[in-house]
Every structure is written in C-alpha cells, then in structure tokens.
Amino acid sequence: MEKTYNPTSIEQALYQTWEEKGYFKPHGDTTKESYSIMIPPPNVTGSLHMGHAFQDTIMDTLIRCERMKGKNTLWQVGTDHAGIATQMVVERKIAAEEGKTKHDYGRDAFIDKIWEWKGESGGTITKQLRRLGASVDWDRERFTMDDGLSNAVQEVFVRLYEDDLIYRGKRLVNWDPKLHTAISDLEVENKDTKGHMWHFRYPLADGVKTADGKDYIVVATTRPETMLGDTGVAVNPEDPRYKDLIGKEIILPIVDRRIPIVGDEHADMEKGTGCVKITPAHDFNDYEVGKRHQLPMINILTFDANIRGAAEVFNTNGEPSDAYSTELPAKYHGMERFAARKAIVAEFDELGLLEEVKDHDLQVPYGDRGGVVIEPMLTDQWYVRTAPLAKTAVEAVENGDIQFVPKQYENMYFSWMRDVQDWCISRQLWWGHRIPAWYDNQGNVYVGRTEEEVRKNNNLESVIELHQDEDVLDTWFSSALWTFGTQGWPEQTDDLKVFHPSDVLVTGFDIIFFWVARMIMMTMHFVKDENGKPQVPFKTVYVTGLIRDENGDKMSKSKGNVLDPIDMIDGIDLESLVEKRTGNMMQPQLAKKIEKNTRKTFENGIEAYGTDALRFTLAAMASTGRDINWDMKRLEGYRNFCNKLWNASRYVMMNTEEQDCGFNGGEIEYSLADKWIESQFELAAKAFNNHIDNFRLDMASNTLYEFIWNQFCDWYLELTKPVLWKGTEAQQRGTRRTLITVLEKTLRLAHPVIPYITETIWQSIKPLVEGVEGETIMLQALPQFDEANFNQEALDDIEWVKAFITSIRNLRAEYDINPGKPLDVMLKAANAEDAARLEANKQVLMSLAKLESVRVLAADEETPACATALVAKSELMIPMAGLIDKDAELARLDGEIKKTHGEIKRIEGKLGNEGFVAKAPEAVVAKEREKLEGYKETLAKLEEQKKTIAAL
C-alpha cells in the first residue's frame, strides 16, 4: 500500500476496471431474489449538481448492499430528453453562433441539430455519474427518445385514446408567450408583486338602476386589458346591493357589447366592489364561472400576448360561435398586452368611467424557464383524464403496496391526487415525442401508431391528404413510463418479469406530483401481473430533502452559491471557481456580489477531497426528508476519516504481512481485546444493516464512523501493541489473525458507502486472509450479525479497561501531569469482579496508561492525598506527592479562575443589557447564554481542583 491515501491516483482507473469487467450487471441467476432501482433520468442537457450527487450516493449505497447480499441487482440508468430545456439550449446556441432561429432551419433540420448537439454534449452527465462511483449497468443505458421508449410512448397514447382517457379540447392553459408553448401549473412560479386595482364603471343597459339609484356598477380588476374579452359580470346572489340586477345587462365600454349580470358564489361580497368582470378566455376562475352560466369565450390575444386584429368567439364547448362580434377597436390591434393595459385605463379615464385606482399586492405568474408573465390562453390541447387513473393510484398507497419514506409525504400525495385536474400533455415545441394524431383537410382527427395504420383503420385513400399534429408530448408523459418502458414494454420481456416492479424510487419532494404520481397512474393502468392485478412501479418512494448552502439558502446560479460535486472530488482554484460562478449569468449585475462572497467563503479555492469523502459526507447528512445545509468542515472531517482508515490498514499490513496469522496451524490464543473487537464488529454489522433497511443512511454512516474511528483505530489498534510487542507466539497469532480478519470484514461493511478506498485496501490484504476469493470486493458478501462471534463479557470487560485508561488520561490533563511520566496507581475495588479485571489486564493498563505500578488497595489500607476518579463503582487513585509543584499549580489555577470570573462577568453584563437582548437575533442571545453556562461549569471544576491541590 502507498504511504499516503491519494484518491486521485486510484479512483478513475478502478472505476474503469469495474465497468470493463461487468461487475455492475445483474448476475442473471433468476433463482435468486432480484432487486432493482430505476435512476430518475437527469436532463440530457445538464451536468451533475449536489442534488444528483446526493441521490445517486443513496441509490448506489442501496444497490451495492443488495448486490453484496447475492441478489440479482439492476440499477437502470438513462437520461431524459427534457423538451423545453434542451430546445432552449440549442436555440440559444444557434442564435449566438449563427444568428439564426429554429425557423431558419425548419423543423426536421432543427431536430437534427438537437441530435447533433446531444451527441457532443449529452455525455457530460453520464461521465460525471461515473466519477461518483455509480454502479449502474451502462450496457442498458436508455434515453427517453430512443426507439424502444418512443414505441412505448406511442403505444400508451393510442391505448389511452382508445380507452377514452385522452381527448382533445379547447381549454385554458398556462401559456408562455416567450417560449410559445403551454406549460404545466407546476412550472409556474407565482411572484409577490406590488400592483394596482383599477375600479371601472360599467353602464347598466335599458335604463336599469342599482338599489342606490346609480345607472352603473363598479367592477374592480388587476388586468384592465382583458376587459375587451368580458362576456359577463358576476355578483353574489346573496348580495342585497345587486341581487335584483341578476339577469339584467350592462353595455361594455369601448366595445359596446351587451353582456349579462350573473349570480355566482365566485363574487365575494366583502372583496373589492362585490362585482367581478368575467373573461372566460383569459382567467382560470372566470373560465369556470363562464361554463356554469354558458357565457361565450372571447379570445383577444395572439400567442405573443398582443391584442388580436379580430377576436375569436367560442361557446363553452370550444366551438366557434356567432354570439358576439369578433370586432376589436382598431387602435388596439397588435398592441403589446401591457401597453394595451395603459391605453385602456387612459380611455376609461377620458370617458369618465375610471372610478379610482388603489395600490394592491398581488401574485403574478411567471414561467420558470422563459421568465415572462404567463398568460391564461384558450388553445386546442390534448388532455389525459386523470380522475379514473388516480383512483387506483391512491388505493396503492392506502393499502401499503407503495410506501413513502418518510411517511408524512403520503399526505402530500393524497391531497394532490384527490383533487387532481386533467393533465394537459401537448406542448408547442419541436423537440420531443410528436403526438401520433393526423388531421384531414376537414379537420377530422385520427389517432394511430403510424400514418399507414391510420389510413388502414379508417379506410382513407391515399388521395386524402393527412398531416400529423405539430405538437409534442409533455416530457413528463414519457418519463411517466420510465420503470416499464425501459424494460421492453409493450413486449412481455424477461426483464419486465424479473425487475418490475422496482424496489425503491429515490426522489425529491418537489417532483412527487410532476413525476411520482404520474408514474404510479401510468404503470398501474398498463402493467398487470399474471393474475391481472395492476403492478406498482416501485414498492417504496424514498423522499430526500434538498441540499442547501451553508446558510440554508437554496443553491442557484443567480445566488452564485452552487457547488459542483466534481470540484469537491478534484479540487478547484479560487480564480476558476469565481469564473465558474460569475460567467454566462442571466443577471450579470449580480456578478460582483457573487465574486465577493465566493472569495470570502473559499479564500484558497476548494481542495481535492476525493469521491469517497464526498459520498460519506452525503450519506452521513441523509436524515430522511430533511433539507441539508452543506458543510465543508464535515467534508474535511470525513476526508480525515478516509485517511484514518488508510493508515490503520497500513498498520495492520505492517504487522501481518509475511507474519504468522494463525492460518497455517499452530496454537492460537485470543486476547480479551480480540474478542471485544469481534463483538463490536458484530454490533456494527447488525446496526448498519438495520439502518440501511430503514433508509437511515445517516445512522448507517455514523455506525461505520464510530466503529472504525473510535473502536477499531483509537482503541483496538492500541490494545494490540502490548501483545504484538510482548505476547506469546499463540497470543500474537490470535491478535494478527483478528487484526486482518476484522479489517477485511470492516472493508466489506463500509464498501457500499466508500467503494474506492475499500476496494483498494481489500485488494492489498486479500492474499493475507484465508478463504477470501474473488476478483472484487463488490461481489463479496455484506457482513451480517453472527451470534457465534459475539461475546458480551468481553464487551463489558473492555469497556471497564477503557474507562480506567480514560480516567488516568483525564486526571493527567486536569492536574497538568506530564503525559509520559510513569505513575503509581491504586484501585479501591468495589467488588471482586473489578479486582479480577485489574489483574487480568494489568499488562495492557500499564502499557496504555503509562503506569509504573498498579495494584488493588487492601480493605483497611490508609491512603495518602490522591487525585481520584470513579471507574464503574470502584475508585481509581493517583498519589499526588512529588508529582506536581504545588505552589506553581495553585498559582496556575488562580490565574485560570480569575480569567473565568472575568468571562462570566463580561457575558452577564451583556445579557443584563436590555438593548442587546431586545435587538440581537435570538440565536446570538441563546449562544451567549450557552457560553455563560459553560464558563460556570469550568469555574466549578477549577475550584474543586484547587481544593484538592491545597489539601496535598
């Protein structure tokens, strides 16, 4: 083994070996239990972020554990075509490099351009996944636009259409005027904005008056421009001010349209004026009111969100209607929506119909990708009827076929599924799965897998022109088929039988609706077991928290606080990190602030920590469902942990290589410490497996840390030294054998979390351990609890020995006794058991506690002035005469006491200041109180020590 642990020199070559040798593949023995995980497919455009690294570490740990249990494991890998995201990247690229738009290319050539770009850049994320040590089966890598998945997507669309679960309708959607596509509710970001509420007078028709004698009513709106499309005014049927006006009409200013006053609960008597303008084609609530009262829908906007030259008028079923004129005032034609808002307010003012304008706080919907205000738009879209599908999907969670970890996320899932809306699945993009529907020149629609099939099924002659729907399917439609589409469905393949349903889905809470729920609905509709029972896509949904920065803020490019996991593996200098965080920003004005913060937080850049340290940190922070504040100090701590394991392994090798480890005959005598470390290992193996089974990777990692650092390195290696130096041959054989076998088992136990370092060390020690065969640690058995190796008595005895040694070390520190000075120690034994323990472990105690002598006091023996400590129920005593300079020690203690008094006074003064307590953040005040308690405890200890020294 190399003298120092250098992850850079081992990781990439080792991964290449694993991949080339095919260790990641399922072993194919179907008599053994199978276990599968389908990776949430990252965007093909993307690169690995901390969230990926976190979830991939969790999945890899789980899959490596199950592989080591001998199961037939598959970790299915793949990437998502990511419709909008990918199209935007390529559109930006051709605009920047060639000054062209997608229309300059045309649909087919532009799609070719995207495939070309995917070929060049699409591999970034999979290369990075390899750097993390992800043991996925690369031979089965899938892409959501590959032939197999495209066939599955077509099949699902056609079957849903045939089952009357897909329909086409004119409905309101969230329209992104910049990207020119519908987007889902979940892609809309509502931003709090300071705006206005305009109060307009709408004149009543036919001489009608209000209860208080006015010939108009006042409506309040935040969107004046949409009044051009009003087809009604709603009042609450219980409102005494207006209930007599229900059924009457108003004359809509500017366009002179007669529209009815309807009674509807949507109008709130307490809010605004109590009268609400109804624009069914431009507001989701109004759309519902319009349907209830059969109000026509008038679309006044183009897809660019400009005022149309002529309106479109439809009835509530979305069919063209002549209920109203399509004319709109000429001066507004082609006007941008917010310019039209100003102009319409000005015209109302000129007409004397602007009652008042009030400041108003409102939420404005923005597209999370396009970044512009979203417009509710009446368009022809394809929809999935989700209610029938949702019923089965809810039952699967209710009856426990699918479990959420943590369980509280079930409630989030239920609340969404029980109020599920039909799912708009069409997108006005070019990149994606094109909708398998064709139209003739009369507007008839035909759905089928191919144009040939459509013609054949509908007896359409070749002279009848057909053109395919221009739209593509929502990206989430194809990713909803991920668990079964990747395994060969609609064919009934062996893979589908063996690996479906998958065992666990590891995902963030933010896509429970987008993806998890839709996967459950789609899978249960299309995949059935041999008894015809719907199959779930996975048995467990493990929901992780988000990784935030050290201050608890979400990591984002605009905040400049994103950490790249690869930078923590390889390291990055400060200038490159600044450039990475401030280059190519959407908001360049933030660059200076980001640079300043980066230079402050990472003065020397980021050093290389290696993959294992990163993985261990991520696993150790994986408390279920909680958000995680990233902490570079913990990463440093776990890199030190890897160093510790490396150095401990070198110690074991130095003491076992070319030595007699008792594998070739000869007498073997195991020490108490040997039996103890075996027992400690069994407890660690038991705890580790339990924690993994319960998805508590944080606790599993803590178990490894506690055992390797505290028990194996800090105690057991020290306890072996007296035996290796002075023990008999039989004792040395026992200790060497224990050293090498426990290390080998420990490497296997830790391998799922830290695969590189464990494989490297294991390859070095493998020849030294009897019965260990095989080319790689990853196909060895994961240790399980073995009762035969467990010895409770040895555990109890060594805990006593540890307490004895720790007490001596603490007393040396307390009384400032030189750590290397041999001491005479006595034990006032509380019972025969403690006396026997002292005798049995005398050699170890004298060696590790650096003692001149140690003995049990006789029952009636007088004792000189001693420093004392309790070990179990017995009293440990160190005679102090001659050990310390009494006067100097008292002077030192007086100095410490004075200093501590000063600190107490200072903090009490601070906390007594009402201004400080009132103004300082709660956390700061709490910290000061904590400090005060600490100083008070220190003072009590110092005064106790002074008393003891004074009595010498």
Swiss-Prot record:
Its EC number is 6.1.1.9. Belongs to the class-I aminoacyl-tRNA synthetase family. ValS type 1 subfamily. A motif ('KMSKS' region) lies at residues 554-558. One of its GO terms (biological process) is valyl-tRNA aminoacylation. It comes from Vibrio parahaemolyticus serotype O3:K6 (strain RIMD 2210633). InterPro entries: aa-tRNA-synth_I_CS (IPR001412), aa-tRNA-synth_Ia (IPR002300), Anticodon_Ia_Val (IPR033705), M/V/L/I-tRNA-synth_anticd-bd (IPR013155), Rossmann-like_a/b/a_fold (IPR014729), tRNA-bd_arm (IPR010978), tRNAsynth_Ia_anticodon-bd (IPR009080), Val-tRNA_synth_C_sf (IPR037118). It catalyses: tRNA(Val) + L-valine + ATP = L-valyl-tRNA(Val) + AMP + diphosphate. It is found in: Cytoplasm. HAMAP family: Val_tRNA_synth_type1. Pfam families: Anticodon_1, tRNA-synt_1, Val_tRNA-synt_C. The keyword Cytoplasm applies. It is an enzyme of class 6 (ligase). Monomer. Catalyzes the attachment of valine to tRNA(Val). As ValRS can inadvertently accommodate and process structurally similar amino acids such as threonine, to avoid such errors, it has a 'posttransfer' editing activity that hydrolyzes mischarged Thr-tRNA(Val) in a tRNA-dependent manner. This is Valine--tRNA ligase. Its main location: cytoplasm.
